């Protein structure tokens, strides 16, 4: 068993509480936490102070935002789950899409088209919710992931100066697998 404690600042209360439970479970079962725990963080010293050995600390830049973190060391658990070859292919696909969004003309640019459709649906058609209903159990957590991503990225009602936005922000995301959502 390997516990990967992932926290950008290594101060997130809920994450550290869960990590503490894992650490206690390991100790209660005669396993040294330093042999079964790793950390992914932008603050190596805090992970080290918490007891994670240097060789098991995977760093990423402090400027990496949550919505982009999968492509950094935060993707460690994904890489373990799907294998390094598949993870490398996923990174290559993301890179290809990044290049497309940067270089494609607006009329053919999938990122621009999808973004404009979201603005159209939310602001002009007044579609305030978005249902996500995967019909494959392997995607059962996709709605929850999309909710978190949407709220982190677009769920704000004020701008950086704290002033109310002139237009509605992103829609409310909801859903469950298949017929449960209907």
Place the predicted regions along the sequence by residue.
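Well-ordered mid-protein domain cores that form the structural environment of catalytic cofactors
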Residues: 1-26
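Active-site phosphate/pyrophosphate-binding segments
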Residues: 18, 25-182
């Amino acid at each position: 068993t390997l516990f990967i404690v992932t926290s950008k600042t290594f101060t997130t209360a809920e994450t550290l509480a869960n990590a503490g439970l894992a650490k206690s479970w390991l100790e209660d079962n005669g396993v040294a936490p330093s042999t079964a725990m790793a950390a992914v963080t932008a603050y190596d010293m805090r992970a080290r102070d918490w007891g994670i050995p240097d060789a098991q600390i995977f760093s990423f830049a402090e400027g990496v935002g949550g919505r982009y973190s999968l492509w950094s060391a935060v993707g460690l658990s994904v890489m373990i789950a799907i294998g390094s070859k598949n993870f490398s292919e996923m990174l290559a696909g993301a890179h290809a899409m990044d290049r497309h969004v940067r270089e494609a003309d607006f009329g053919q640019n999938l990122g621009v088209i999808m973004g404009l459709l979201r603005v159209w649906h939310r602001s002009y058609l007044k579609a305030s919710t978005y249902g996500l209903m995967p019909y494959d159990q392997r995607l059962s957590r996709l709605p929850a992931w999309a909710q978190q991503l949407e709220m982190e990225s677009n769920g704000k009602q004020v701008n950086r100066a704290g002033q109310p936005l002139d237009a509605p922000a992103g829609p409310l995301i909801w859903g469950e697998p298949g017929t449960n959502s209907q």
